[in-house]
């Protein structure tokens, strides 16, 4: 089983190739470039270095949110371009579950992936022994701390909101806690790929046409048009027409980059029909 993992939900772009319980290769890039500049070259490089080709893939696992609206769209465009071009199934992986997967081996510890949602809020969820407890949500950091203080036990935090709110957490938490180190702090495509492998075994793959992103909060443009408070937003699903309307680098992220497709393909560029 060969799976390509893609995560572009935050500042870090990450791709990984995973086969039969082994991470063959993983690249992550967080150097200030846009994901449209880094993602496809990283995908091409990972196939070149491992000697595998696109046509060998059993599936592509991609982080489907929550996260940066623009970043998620670029990852989706990349994954959909490959999936539609080479008839490869897609696997939708929660960004928060992917973060929790970084430290799944931790036993009897509440794991809290927290992503900066701005406006003093975080995207978060709680996991125990690898299982989601409750729901994914966007919540104020102080409200989150108050909730966690009502949960006896050990707690572990990771995600890009840790450096943003670390001082607040240290000042207000009354339960035992730890923070992730640099190696596990941010999103990793290998975790996305491993979760994708589990989903594929359960028959949860979808086609490129049926893949949709999920957001906990509405995009900024929609939020500005509505008067309701942020907490009132439910998880919303991507409008399939959004990718068609997206201009410039977001929509073109997966276009015309040379990737070895394997034997039998005369044109090994990613098709334009995203």
Each language-model region and where it sits:
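DPxDG-like acidic metal-binding loop motif
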Residues: 63-90, 95
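Gly/Ser/Thr-rich beta-alpha loop segments that engage phosphate groups in nucleotides
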Residues: 12, 34, 65-69, 73, ...
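Acyltransferase
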Residues: 178-249
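N-terminal beta-alpha supersecondary unit
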Residues: 1-64, 243, 251, 264-265, ...
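Stable alpha-helical structural segments in soluble proteins, enriched in small hydrophobic residues
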Residues: 46-50, 85, 103, 189-200
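Surface "functional belts" at beta-alpha junctions
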Residues: 22, 34, 89-187, 215, ...
């Amino acid at each position: 089983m060969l799976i390509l993992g893609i995560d572009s939900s935050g500042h870090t772009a990450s791709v990984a190739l995973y086969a039969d319980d082994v991470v063959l290769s993983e690249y992550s890039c967080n150097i200030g470039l846009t994901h449209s500049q880094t993602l496809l070259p990283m995908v091409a490089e990972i196939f070149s270095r491992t000697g595998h080709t696109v046509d060998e893939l059993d599936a592509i696992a991609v982080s489907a949110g929550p996260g940066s609206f623009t970043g998620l769209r670029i990852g989706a465009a990349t994954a959909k371009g490959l999936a539609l071009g080479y008839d490869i199934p897609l696997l939708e992986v929660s960004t928060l579950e992917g973060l929790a997967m970084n430290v799944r081996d931790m036993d009897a510890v509440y794991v809290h992936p927290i992503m900066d949602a701005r406006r003093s809020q975080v995207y978060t969820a709680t996991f125990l022994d690898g299982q989601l407890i409750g729901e994914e949500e966007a919540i104020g950091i102080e409200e989150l701390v108050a909730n966690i203080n009502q949960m006896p036990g050990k707690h572990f935090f990771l995600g890009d909101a840790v450096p943003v709110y670390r001082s607040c957490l240290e000042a207000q938490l009354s339960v035992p806690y730890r923070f992730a180190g640099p190696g596990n702090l941010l999103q990793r495509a290998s975790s996305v790929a491993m979760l994708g492998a589990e989903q594929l075994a359960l028959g949860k793959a979808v086609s490129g046409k049926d893949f949709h992103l999920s957001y906990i909060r509405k995009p900024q443009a929609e939020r500005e048009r509505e008067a309701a408070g942020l907490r009132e937003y439910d998880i919303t699903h991507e409008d399939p027409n959004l990718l068609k309307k997206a201009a410039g680098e977001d929509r073109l992220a997966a276009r015309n980059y040379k990737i070895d497709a394997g034997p039998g393909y005369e044109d090994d560029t990613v098709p334009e029909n995203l």
